[in-house]
Amino acid sequence: MKKNIGKITQIISAVVDVKFTNKGKLPQILNALECYNDKQRIVLEIAQHIGDDTVRCIAMNSTEGLVRGMEVVDTGSPISIPVGIETLGRIMNVVGEPIDGKGKIKGSSISSIYKSAPSFTQQSTDRNILVTGIKVVDLLAPYTKGGKIGLFGGAGVGKTVLIMELINNVAKAHGGYTVFAGVGERTREGNDLYHEMIDSGVINLEEPEKSKVALVYGQMNEPPGARARVALTGLTVAESFRDMNEGQDVLFFVDNIFRFTQAGSEVSALLGRIPSAVGYQPTLATDMGELQERITSTKHGSITSVQAIYVPADDLTDPAPATSFAHLDATTVLSRQIAELGIYPAVDPLDSTSQVLDPMIVGEEHYNVARKVQQILQTYKSLQDIIAILGMDELSEEDKLTVSRARKIQRFLSQPFHVAEVFTGAEGKFVNLADTIAGFKGLTEGKYDDLPEAAFYMVGTIEEALEKAKTLK
């Protein structure tokens, strides 16, 4: 079949205009075009048709070195990437090219990054708890298998560390496969994650097919087109694992979903669309919906997704984080005030929510303990103004006891992480759900009122707190 060839007529940053002279052969919207610059393959994705013979494209690679008059070939289909077992243990970029220096991904099947979401009849409605081993999450905002989880937080409060710990705790204990999509984050973190996975055995370099994870990176230095599409590339790999054989349970980590929105905003501005609120693209809700609706569980397999969501200027009402709220089953909100107290993970126990914190799903005891913990912490929060102005002495005996318990609960919500051992020197802890419930139940009932607050800081189970208390007395 004769190739459909066009020529570059205009280049403005990441936006490239291509003119096709074949009448009636204008490529479709979202088709991938290819051109070669010094033997390097450059992929362009069609975003708009301008007139009868010109298309406006978004570049997936750097446009450095491109010149007007260069030949461009229509591939006849959207961006397509390798999927399946062969991607395990490998790192790909947005267009499916390996970037780990280990050669071509051989023998894999090819799939378009654009697909429709599963129909209602295919979707599963089962609700099972996913135990993470992180006390504050398991107790107050539990995650579901096949659910969508958002980690909200401003700059530097620990979203990536929490994602790394979840990969460590859940992906290692988890039988299925894991896909990690690095969207517009630091290259250093992506490199650290890759080497940590090799050290921990999640990636097997000798026999890549025995690895548990596939990585897809489109980092901060990439053009906006790549950052706006790399989440779809990662999701396509995750969907292929979910639908394999008789179905699989897949974990899909995205760090960071805000960068997906941010890249969409840059692309939108480059294409000349009129911005909406706070300068975001007018299609913000549509873009987010197209991605999130595909992250779902079917009757064959499930995708459990954990998404880090950067919150600009710590403002949860910003359109980017606010748009993603509607799609999530559980939200874990990281708070700068809690991080300032030195309590890590800096999860806000009152702002974090979960649809499965329901006595019908988690059981009466878990639900009652969680609500009691939140009640004590809420009372302490409302008393803080009085304490700041008048001091502790002006409180009633009952309020003093509540404050004392709240401070112990606050410290007991902290926990040493496996992935932070290098920085803290403290051994990481995985706490079972039964131990978490028992520990907090004892605290709310006043069993440990005589122990010092420091005993509860950075420990795993309540038994460890009791041991620590002996060394403090």
Curated annotation (Swiss-Prot):
Q: Which GO terms describe its cellular component?
A: plasma membrane; proton-transporting ATP synthase complex
Q: InterPro entries per the record?
A: AAA+_ATPase, ATP-synt_VA_C, ATP_synth_F1_bsu, ATPase_a/bsu_AS, ATPase_alpha/beta_chains, ATPase_F1/V1/A1_a/bsu_N, ATPase_F1/V1/A1_a/bsu_N_sf, ATPase_F1/V1/A1_a/bsu_nucl-bd
Q: Which UniProt keywords apply?
A: ATP synthesis, ATP-binding, Cell inner membrane, Cell membrane, CF(1), Hydrogen ion transport, Ion transport, Membrane, Nucleotide-binding, Translocase, Transport
**Pfam families of this UniProt entry?**
ATP-synt_ab, ATP-synt_ab_N, ATP-synt_VA_C
Recorded E.C. number(s)? 7.1.2.2
Does Transport appear among the keywords? yes
List localization entries: Cell inner membrane
Which domain of life does the UniProt lineage start with?
Answer: Bacteria
GO MF annotation, one: ATP hydrolysis activity
Positions with a binding annotation for ATP = 153-160
Q: Provide the catalytic activity annotation.
A: ATP + H2O + 4 H(+)(in) = ADP + phosphate + 5 H(+)(out)
Q: How does it sit in the membrane?
A: Peripheral membrane protein
Quote the function comment for this protein: Produces ATP from ADP in the presence of a proton gradient across the membrane. The catalytic sites are hosted primarily by the beta subunits.
PANTHER family on file: ATP SYNTHASE, ATP SYNTHASE SUBUNIT BETA, MITOCHONDRIAL
What the record says about family reads: Belongs to the ATPase alpha/beta chains family.
Q: How does it assemble?
A: F-type ATPases have 2 components, CF(1) - the catalytic core - and CF(0) - the membrane proton channel. CF(1) has five subunits: alpha(3), beta(3), gamma(1), delta(1), epsilon(1). CF(0) has three main subunits: a(1), b(2) and c(9-12). The alpha and beta chains form an alternating ring which encloses part of the gamma chain. CF(1) is attached to CF(0) by a central stalk formed by the gamma and epsilon chains, while a peripheral stalk is formed by the delta and b chains.
Can you say what this protein is called? ATP synthase subunit beta
